[in-house]
Amino acid sequence: MTAQKLDGTATAAAIKGELTTRVAALHERGIRPGLGTILVGDDPGSRWYVNGKHKDCAEVGIESIRIDLPATATQDEIEDAVRVLNDDPACTGYIVQLPLPKGRDENRVLGLIDPAKDADGLHPTNLGWLVLGKAAPLPCTPNGIVELLRRHGVEIAGAEVTVVGRGVTVGRPLGLLLTRRSENATVTLCHTGTRDLAAHVRGADIVVAAAGVPGIVTGAMVKPGAAVLDVGVSRVDGKLAGDVAPEVWDVARWVSPNPGGVGPMTRAMLLSNIVAMAEQTDS
């Protein structure tokens, strides 16, 4: 068996086409959605991610608002930038690019974001609404995973899902999304401290690997015909490596490549959050 590809690049392109139409309709009503970013320092990876987000905005007609601060920016200066975007009517929503330089209080900065402008869907208030099942901006990567599965016809309702990784950006909120009544999956959350990871993975119809441990999910662990999504990012000998070993492609029915799988979907869901926020202001 050679797995079919869960093609995040093509799926994200289709979503951006849909968003372009929705943004054009907003423009006709005099509403111009705007995405803001706060970047502190000059880390090449962070700058690449931010540049990509603004490129995506240009493709669908969303305005860009950038605040770039030096690595020497103080905690107060970063918090002031957050307040600027909170108060800017041209900014529909925004993100603070992480990580911040050492010595800065990331949780305090993120807590200052206006929850209504939380484009990443990771503000404590919005995560709380997710727990309660109320409408709020959704975390981009988990939402992208669900959308990628849905658009490829992978059955989620009733599926046994094993999530490997307990991070706040993927593992923990993904379980909340997948157990909503609209998805109705049964989720097992594993991590690097799980005693018998193979047993949990082997029983899963869907596996999401997001531990940041290269090759933690092997072909021997995976049930034939499962869907496997590789979300982990780490480096081995200076090269990017995912959490899913190559031989998984010979066992699974569906595999998301890394790169080209969940990453493009994360960016597409960020745009989707901005457009949804703008549409709510028009309602």
Swiss-Prot record:
GO terms for biological process: L-histidine biosynthetic process; methionine biosynthetic process; purine nucleotide biosynthetic process; tetrahydrofolate interconversion. GO terms for cellular component: cytosol. Pathway: One-carbon metabolism; tetrahydrofolate interconversion. Keywords: Amino-acid biosynthesis, Histidine biosynthesis, Hydrolase, Methionine biosynthesis, Multifunctional enzyme, NADP, One-carbon metabolism, Oxidoreductase, Purine biosynthesis. The keyword Aminoacyl-tRNA synthetase does not apply. It comes from the Bacteria. Transmembrane segments: none annotated. Its EC number is 1.5.1.5, 3.5.4.9. The keyword Amino-acid biosynthesis applies. It holds the Pfam family THF_DHG_CYH. GO terms for molecular function: methenyltetrahydrofolate cyclohydrolase activity; methylenetetrahydrofolate dehydrogenase (NADP+) activity. NADP(+) binds at G165, R166, G167, T192, V233. It catalyses: (6R)-5,10-methylene-5,6,7,8-tetrahydrofolate + NADP(+) = (6R)-5,10-methenyltetrahydrofolate + NADPH; (6R)-5,10-methenyltetrahydrofolate + H2O = (6R)-10-formyltetrahydrofolate + H(+). InterPro entries: Aminoacid_DH-like_N_sf (IPR046346), NAD(P)-bd_dom_sf (IPR036291), THF_DH/CycHdrlase (IPR000672), THF_DH/CycHdrlase_cat_dom (IPR020630), THF_DH/CycHdrlase_NAD-bd_dom (IPR020631). Signal peptide: none annotated. Belongs to the tetrahydrofolate dehydrogenase/cyclohydrolase family. Catalyzes the oxidation of 5,10-methylenetetrahydrofolate to 5,10-methenyltetrahydrofolate and then the hydrolysis of 5,10-methenyltetrahydrofolate to 10-formyltetrahydrofolate. Homodimer. This is Bifunctional protein FolD 2. It comes from Nocardioides sp. (strain ATCC BAA-499 / JS614). The gene is folD2.
